[in-house]
Structures are given as structure tokens and as C-alpha cells.
Amino acid sequence: MSLTQGMKAKQLLAYFQGKADQDAREAKARGELVCWSASVAPPEFCVTMGIAMIYPETHAAGIGARKGAMDMLEVADRKGYNVDCCSYGRVNMGYMECLKEAAITGVKPEVLVNSPAADVPLPDLVITCNNICNTLLKWYENLAAELDIPCIVIDVPFNHTMPIPEYAKAYIADQFRNAISQLEVICGRPFDWKKFKEVKDQTQRSVYHWNRIAEMAKYKPSPLNGFDLFNYMALIVACRSLDYAEITFKAFADELEENLKAGIYAFKGAEKTRFQWEGIAVWPHLGHTFKSMKNLNSIMTGTAYPALWDLHYDANDESMHSMAEAYTRIYINTCLQNKVEVLLGIMEKGQVDGTVYHLNRSCKLMSFLNVETAEIIKEKNGLPYVSIDGDQTDPRVFSPAQFDTRVQALVEMMEANMAAAE
């Protein structure tokens, strides 16, 4: 009997999150390779080669959500990493320094012993991709330099125009082949193209069920609380090329569909307004942001951030052009016009009444674009919006009082618009 038989989706999420970390620890103990990977770098290549995967962004988000970010940020501060650098990167570099010290001295530093961070091993290689930001290049370059390990970089050009030209897909496919060649050298064996096809098929099954979950937000009232996407996205990031994600997402999507048929909704009849959240979650204050909106009877039914992992492609395409397109069409890797169109589509599908824009100190790419994006979208659909200050992992930047004041104003504007439309 399977250990997961009879588990609900929430239980599966916790089980497989822990198992992914355990897999990496066991692989390290057996002398097998462990890779630290950027969140939207293709995992398909490493999984095909049997390399255990750890995702520093997800790991840092978990540390932030468990209120442990400050200890790691202080370690990074002492190493000279400026507060203006990405806090995911600073948390991860702090954690890496602690692991490195433990490996050298044989003694875990106190800050690591007391940390709520998930226990993951040091990497034997790192792989990064600049399809979400260029900060990842220097971050992973530093990891590789500090640990004296290989760094594989997959270069994905920014899309200044849409649609994506064929020459861009061809270039990215060449980047994929180059990464595969590097892995063959590192692993000392040839790439298994038959297994690669199986891994791509698995990835597409995971993405399919992930999209089933996101689709549930279109119903009114919604059976899906949009904040749940932030929780479940750990597996679409870290395990999309494993059946861990498929099993969990299928269970959650099935549960949501059953609830919809039974008339069971996320807010149990208390849903009054619907909003879009644009940007990364404020992980150290995730509970506050959710509860504040729920207390105002406002439900999140739109967010583009988890949709970054809507990485559907043709697994039968041996040229890898389809896969290349999937990894480059991510909305924050495209021009402002396309970003606006993506957000407008999400807002329409989710039947939202307004938007919360997270001006994230860490994520300059998303935050700087959001100022202009917000105005363009308001001109197009007339829906109100507010901006809130915060950070994805550094708890010091977010002000609960500011958040509460601004979202209350947003809800008042949304309710006024609804009353005027009646």
C-alpha cells in the first residue's frame, strides 16, 4: 500500500515537500550529485541525468514564511551582501555560508541549529537561467565561486517584441543542448534521450493539473482561495518533472471540482469582492495579507506569479523549439505590452474587481514595471488598484498598518463600483 494512499491534497503537499528534501539528503549521502537550480530553469535535463534538485528561491521563501529570514540575512550582511540585493539571494547565500562552515569545521553554527530552514545539502553543481531576472546570474556565479563547483547558465533573451521569433527559439534550444553537453561531462555518461522524453511527459502532466487548479478561480463564487496557489506552487517549482507534483495537483484539483459541484466555496458564502495580486507573495507576512483580505470578504481570484510555471510545450518536439518557447514566453521576460495583455486576461478570467500591486524591494524587474503597468491597465478596464510596499523575504520592509489601510481603500473602491453598476 502506498504511503500516500488516502491523503488529502494538503497532506500530500507537506509529504512531498519533505520527501524532495529527503531525496537530496539521501543522494548526497550516497555520493550522488545534488544541483541547486533557479526556479524557472528547466529541471528536465538534471532529472533525466538522475541528479537530485534543490531550489534556493523556494527554500528561501520557506525560511521567510517560517520567520527565519533575519538570521540568514544577517549572515549575508556580514559577508558584504548589500541590503539592496535580492533577499532570496541574500537568505540563500547566508544559508550556504552556514552549510559551508559546518562542512569545514564539522560543527553546525548556532544560527543553523536554531533555524527553521529545511535541511538541504550543499550542491555539487548549480544551474541558472535568466528568463525571470539577471540577478540570478551573479547569485549563482557567486555560489559556484564560493563552493568551487560547476555553474551551468542557460541564456534566454528578453522578448522586446511578440510573438517570439523562430531564431530566438533556435538559440534557446542550442542553449539547452549546450547544458546537456555540460551535464554529460559533469556526470561522465551520455544523456539518455529516451528517459528525457519520459521526463518531459511527466512535466506536462504536472503542468496540466497545475492549470486545472488555477482554472477554478474563474467560478463565482470561487471554490479556490487564490492564496492556496502560493502554498502549492512549491511543488510546481521543485517537483514539476517528478510525479510528486502530478499526484498532489490532481488530488487538489479533484477536491476543488467536487467542492464546486457540492456548492462548497472558499469563503463559504462570504465572498463579496475579488482581486488580483500582482507580484511575489510577502512570505514573512503571508498570513497577515490573507487574513486581512478575508476579513474584508475579498478573495484573490487572479495572480500571474504562480502562472510563471504554466510551462506547457510539445513533449514530442525533438528540436526542443516548443520547450524553448515555453521557457521564454514567461510574462516578465516579455515587453510591457505583452505583460499588460497577460494581466488583463487573468483579470477577465478571474472576474476581478481590482488589483493589489506588490512593490517588492527585492524584485526590481517586477516592481519597476508595475508602476506603469498599473496605469495602463486602469486606462483599459477602469478597475481600481493600490500598491503596497513589501519584500518577498525581508520582513522589515512590510508594514501591516500600511497594507491594511490601502487594501481597505481598495475594497471600498471595488464595492462602490459594484454598487454603481447595479
Swiss-Prot record:
Activity regulation, short description: Activated by the LcdC protein.
Instruction: Cite the entry's keywords alphabetically.
Output: 4Fe-4S, Flavoprotein, FMN, Iron, Iron-sulfur, Lyase, Metal-binding
Indicate whether Lyase appears among the record's keywords.
yes
Report the EC code(s) recorded for this entry. 4.2.1.54
Return one GO MF term. Answer: lactoyl-CoA dehydratase activity
Tell me the Pfam families matching this sequence.
HGD-D
Q: Which cofactor does it need?
A: [4Fe-4S] cluster; FMN; riboflavin; Mg(2+)
Instruction: Give the main EC class.
Output: lyase
Q: What does the record note about the cofactor?
A: Binds 1 [4Fe-4S] cluster.
Q: Does the keyword Transferase apply?
A: no
Write down the chemical reaction(s) this protein catalyses.
Answer: (R)-lactoyl-CoA = acryloyl-CoA + H2O; (2R)-hydroxybutanoyl-CoA = (2E)-butenoyl-CoA + H2O
Which InterPro entries does UniProt cross-reference here?
FldB/FldC_alpha/beta
| Miscellaneous comment as given in the Swiss-Prot or TrEMBL entry | The elimination of water from 2-hydroxybutyryl-CoA or lactoyl-CoA occurs in a syn mode.
Quaternary state and interactors: Heterodimer of an alpha (LcdA) and a beta (LcdB) subunit.
Family designation: Belongs to the FldB/FldC dehydratase alpha/beta subunit family.
Q: Name the job this protein performs.
A: Involved in the acrylate pathway for the conversion of D-lactic acid to propionic acid. Catalyzes the reversible dehydration of Lactoyl-CoA and 2-hydroxybutyroyl-CoA to acryloyl-CoA and crotonyl-CoA, respectively.
Spell out the protein name for this chain: Lactoyl-CoA dehydratase subunit alpha
* Organism of derivation: Anaerotignum propionicum (Clostridium propionicum)
